[in-house]
Amino acid sequence: MCIRDSAVTDVLKKCILTRGIKVDDLPTFDIEYLFLNIRAKSIGEDIKLTVTCPDDGETKVPVTIYVDEIKVIRPKEHNIDIVLDDKMSLRMKYPSLNQFIESNFDTEDEAETIVDKTFRVVADCMDTIFDGEDAWEAKDYSAQERLDFVQQLNSQQYKKVEKFFSTMPKLSHTIEVVNPNTKEKGSVVLEGLADFFA
């Protein structure tokens, strides 16, 4: 979801009446799914788009997608529990919309690199640290202590953490198209809220 303004969250905050639900704390895939379904109830269950045929990368064709067919896809290999070594593991939580915006758009600290921001997101998404039989809530540690923990991970351990993020659930829908010029069939995958409003 590549939006800086609060239009989506403003709509959700006005529509979600359940006490205790903080829209800013919801994972981005939940926000996208909720917004898409609110949009469906508001202006219609179908979305008309123009997509590019994958066989030639040029021909554009109109398609209609029905919102109730769009799902949040959770890959089978995705797991919130990450085994770091024989004794230590992490339980992760999904980044909230606020964390997503801060890591992708926050420019307050110009000196902070992409790597720094990535480490900060990982540190913020740690929920529980397990060491043998002991468990610690990450929130009981300072932001700097969590960041130090992330920075001391070796490359193999960090790849496991990266897998958590790369396989996170996401709004996704695959449509089949036929190129009217070549008659070739192809699949187009739409992912994330922006693809459904292109």
Task: Locate the predicted segments by residue.
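Structured interface patches
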Residues: S6-I21, N79
